Structure formats: structure tokens, C-alpha cells
Amino acid sequence: MTNLIRSNFQDHPFHLVSPSPWPLYTSVSLLNLATSAALSMHNFNNSYYLFFISLILVISSMAFWFRDIISEATLLGDHTLAVQKGLNLGVILFIVSEALFFLAIFWAFFHSSLTPTVELGSQWPPIGIEPINPFELPLLNTVILLSSGATVTYAHHSLIHGERKGALYGSIITILLAIIFTVFQGVEYNVSSFTISDGAFGTCFYFGTGFHGFHVIIGTIFLAVALWRIFAYHLTDNHHVGFEGGILYWHFVDVVWLFLYVSIYYWGS
């Protein structure tokens, strides 16, 4: 469907998208994934099989959800003004809910660090914990993630101005930086001297940075889908709601990492 014909179909306030089962399927799959992960940590029988099955269900639900959204937007022309507003509102509410989740993580961290108990040695970091140097790999990861925020903004502005090559190159560089960040995060976990079982410090550190790393992976998937859609001429200079949602999510990931770096890596060490 050409951009001119698609704009004629979408330039009205009616909601054309049919109810989708994928949000429910994805939510149930994520619940099973979290439950099976907790059971696996406590070595329940066959919990690892349930974990991998749940992971496959999450990935497949997301894939089918992406497929339907792309078909509705590009092939059917169902993403009218009302649908676009609903998608934007959904992204904003999703980010707000994630921000509240991270608020709980920071609350747990500052509660433990500002009032360390006797079991922690009445000090922070607790006795026996050697924190990670914030000016080594964490600082490099900070530069990498902030650079990815700049490159994705460049890709966005390039798409708005009709510069397809700039949008492609900016998106590719952003995804590469995201992959490098994820790899370095794994290296950091591998060389650290403490684990998630080492008291409140280890739990808050790995839960906060690990949950952020999970968001980086999700954001990378969003941007990879947007890159494919740019490559396939699905996105235009005035219609790229999915790309804008992925960019907004990526900037949220950047901001959360800054709070993690300053509080957990720098101040917490």
C-alpha cells in the first residue's frame, strides 16, 4: 500500500483494529517465566524445562504480536489517528509501570544501604564484599549506552527529514552498541567477586542491573524490528509510531542506567 493511499485510509478518528489475544498470551507467558525462574533458583524438579518452555512462549507471543501490528499498520491501513493515540498512550503507561518497578528496586537498595543492619556489619558495603570499581567497566558501559541514545536520536531525526540512509546507519550503530553493552555486562558479572546470594548488597546489585539488562535486550529487539521496517520501506517521515515507541523506551533505559550507575556503582561502593 503506497503512502498516499495509506494516509487516505488512516486520516480519520475511528478505531479499526480488532481485539488481539497476544497481550494476554504474553502476560501469562511472562508470569510463567518469572514463576519457573524462581522455582529454578530453588532447584525444584523439572523447573528448568518449564523455564525454557515459558521463554519460548514469550518469544513466540512477541513475534506474533509484532507480526499483527506490522500487518495492521502497513498492509491493512488500520492504524488510524485513534489507534496511533492508543499505541502512544500504551507505551507511556508501560514505561510508567516500569519506572515504578525500578522505584521499588531503588527503595530496597537505599533502605539497606542507609540503615545497614548488624547482620551486614552495620556498614555499607557489608563486610567481606568487594564492590566493582565504578571507573572501569561500568563507566565504559555508561559511555556506550549514552552513545547509543545519541545514535538512535540521529536515526530518528534522519527518518523525519526523509534521509533513509541516516536512519538505517543510526539504527544499526545503536543496535551494535546495545549488543556490546549487554556483552560487557555479562563480562562484569563473570569477573565480580560476589554473587546474588551475598546478602542485601548482592541481591540489590544483581536484581537492579540484571533487570535493567533485561530491558536493554527488550529494547534491542524493538529497535531491530524498527530497523527491519525501515529497510523494508514500512516507515515514513510522518508515520513511524513503532519506531518512536522504541526510541522513547530506549531513552528510558538510558535514564535508569544513569540512576543505577550513580547510586549503586558510585555511591554504593
From Swiss-Prot:
Matching PANTHER family: CYTOCHROME C OXIDASE SUBUNIT 3, CYTOCHROME C OXIDASE SUBUNIT III
SUPFAM superfamilies linked to this entry: Cytochrome c oxidase subunit III-like
Protein family per UniProt: Belongs to the cytochrome c oxidase subunit 3 family.
Catalytic activity: 4 Fe(II)-[cytochrome c] + O2 + 8 H(+)(in) = 4 Fe(III)-[cytochrome c] + 2 H2O + 4 H(+)(out)
Gene3D superfamilies the record matches: 1.10.287.70, Cytochrome c oxidase, subunit III, four-helix bundle (1.20.120.80)
Organism of provenance: Podospora anserina (strain S / ATCC MYA-4624 / DSM 980 / FGSC 10383)
A Pfam cross-reference name: COX3
Membrane topology per record: Multi-pass membrane protein
BP GO terms, sorted: mitochondrial electron transport, cytochrome c to oxygen
Entry function: Component of the cytochrome c oxidase, the last enzyme in the mitochondrial electron transport chain which drives oxidative phosphorylation. The respiratory chain contains 3 multisubunit complexes succinate dehydrogenase (complex II, CII), ubiquinol-cytochrome c oxidoreductase (cytochrome b-c1 complex, complex III, CIII) and cytochrome c oxidase (complex IV, CIV), that cooperate to transfer electrons derived from NADH and succinate to molecular oxygen, creating an electrochemical gradient over the inner membrane that drives transmembrane transport and the ATP synthase.
Transmembrane segments: 46-66, 90-110, 138-160, 167-187, 207-227, 247-267
EC number: 7.1.1.9
Source organism, top-level taxon: Eukaryota
Designated name of the protein: Cytochrome c oxidase subunit 3
Annotated PROSITE patterns: COX3
Single GO term (MF): cytochrome-c oxidase activity
